[in-house]
């Protein structure tokens, strides 16, 4: 058994436990896979874009989390100190806007049923569709066990604030983010009272 005591770890919330159970019971269902389509209508500095995503992963432990359960009394989320994250660039040239949209739709269908390995972080991926069109489309896919509907817009806001700063050659200091661990500790304290 792997010793997880040296990495940050904590229990799952009840909702996360349900999602983990579902991911293990019904693989490739796509039920808890979130897909966000991002359209960028300007010339993109892909180096700055990648660095912005990597900075956000560094800032938010939950985005570096994996889940373990085998041989344990209860599942744990383990926060990796660092994770590898590189967008997948898909090149589509000589396509009309509608043909590019068809390629994105095809990708969405296949991507939705491409499971994450819950024991490997990060539980997210980014596909970047480059073409002759004056815009770039991206698909950010993540497992819902990481982020809820109120959290993911905040993550995207940080990505684009960092991207704008990096593209301008500036350093942006963001306010400290509250780690998900605090929520888990609050839940456990509430359950004990």
Language model features: what each stretch is:
Residues 3-81, 86, 95-192:
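Acyl-group handoff/entry surfaces in thioester-processing enzymes
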Residues 92:
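Helicase-core coupling region on the C-terminal RecA-like lobe
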């Amino acid at each position: 058994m792997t010793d997880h005591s040296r990495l940050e770890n904590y229990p799952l919330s009840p909702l996360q436990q349900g999602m983990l159970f579902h991911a293990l019971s019904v693989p490739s269902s796509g039920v808890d896979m979130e897909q966000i389509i991002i359209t960028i209508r300007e010339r993109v500095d892909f180096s700055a874009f990648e660095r912005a995503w990597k900075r956000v992963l560094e800032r938010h432990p939950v985005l570096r989390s994996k889940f373990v359960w085998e041989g344990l009394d209860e599942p744990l989320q383990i926060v990796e100190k660092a994770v590898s994250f590189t967008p997948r660039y898909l090149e589509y040239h000589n396509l009309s806007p509608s043909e590019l949209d068809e390629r994105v739709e095809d990708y969405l269908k296949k991507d939705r049923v491409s499971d994450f390995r819950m024991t490997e972080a990060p539980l997210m991926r980014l596909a970047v569709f480059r073409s002759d069109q004056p815009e770039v489309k991206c698909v950010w896919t993540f497992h819902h066990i990481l982020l809820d509907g109120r959290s993911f817009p905040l993550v995207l806001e940080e990505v684009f604030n960092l991207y704008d700063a990096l593209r301008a050659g500036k350093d942006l200091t963001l306010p400290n983010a509250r780690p998900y661990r605090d929520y888990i500790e609050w839940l456990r304290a509430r359950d004990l009272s």
